[in-house]
Every structure is written in C-alpha cells, then in structure tokens.
C-alpha cells in the first residue's frame, strides 16, 4: 500500500467512526481534525484515534492503554492482540461510555 492509498483508507475509517458514533444514539462528543479524532464521554474520559501515516497504522489511546492497528486483508487489526478494530473500539467505547454499544462501519 502506498501513502496515497493509506491516507484514503485511513480517512474513510475516521469518517466511518464519526458516523457510527452519531448513529449510536449515545451521548459521545467527537472532534476530528487533521487525522486525529477525539471522542469525549460524559465522565470526561477520552478515546483518541489518530493516523500514523509514516507507519501506515491507526493508533488508539483509551483511558486504559494504547493500541496500534495495521491493515490486513481489508481489516484493521491490533498488532499485539490481533483483535479486529471495530470489536476493540466497541468494547473501549462501551467501557468509557458506561453503556453497552456496538459500533461498525456502515
């Protein structure tokens, strides 16, 4: 994957996250700027998702830890655990929002 392809795919992922948050109906504020998406919850905790263009990765920082995701066969997966991105994000957001929800790309 070249840099242009990465940027298109990563930007599409960030947009899909915004749309999934909006569609969830849960009160989560989000702000995206320059490849960085910040989710802010009622309890003032945050999840920060950002592009790491030089590495062709997506990094996610939660209240508890950080994760690096790489694109494998059209699916973003955690470099350490192998967990799929949307499953991980659903769990992280559910924990920090203190309500169960499932996020996915539309």
Curated annotation (Swiss-Prot):
Cited Pfam families: Frataxin_Cyay
Domain of life: Bacteria
InterPro entries in the record: CyaY, Frataxin/CyaY, Frataxin/CyaY_sf, Frataxin_CS
Transmembrane helix found in the keyword field: no
Single annotated GO MF: ferric iron binding
Family according to the record: Belongs to the frataxin family.
PANTHER family named among the record's database cross-references: FRATAXIN (PTHR16821), FRATAXIN, MITOCHONDRIAL (PTHR16821:SF2)
The protein's name in its UniProt record: Iron-sulfur cluster assembly protein CyaY
Organism this protein belongs to: Colwellia psychrerythraea (strain 34H / ATCC BAA-681)
Biological classification of the source: Bacteria, Pseudomonadati, Pseudomonadota, Gammaproteobacteria, Alteromonadales
């Amino acid at each position: 994957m070249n840099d242009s392809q990465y940027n298109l795919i990563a930007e599409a992922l960030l947009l899909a996250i915004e749309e999934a948050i909006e569609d969830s109906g849960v009160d989560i504020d989000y702000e995206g700027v320059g490849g960085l998406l910040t989710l802010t919850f009622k309890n003032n905790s945050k999840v920060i998702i950002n592009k790491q263009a030089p590495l062709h990765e997506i990094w996610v920082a939660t209240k508890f830890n950080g994760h690096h995701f790489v694109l494998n066969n059209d699916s973003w997966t955690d470099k350490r655990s192998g967990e799929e991105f949307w499953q991980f994000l659903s769990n992280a957001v559910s924990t920090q929002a203190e309500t169960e929800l499932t996020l996915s790309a539309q």
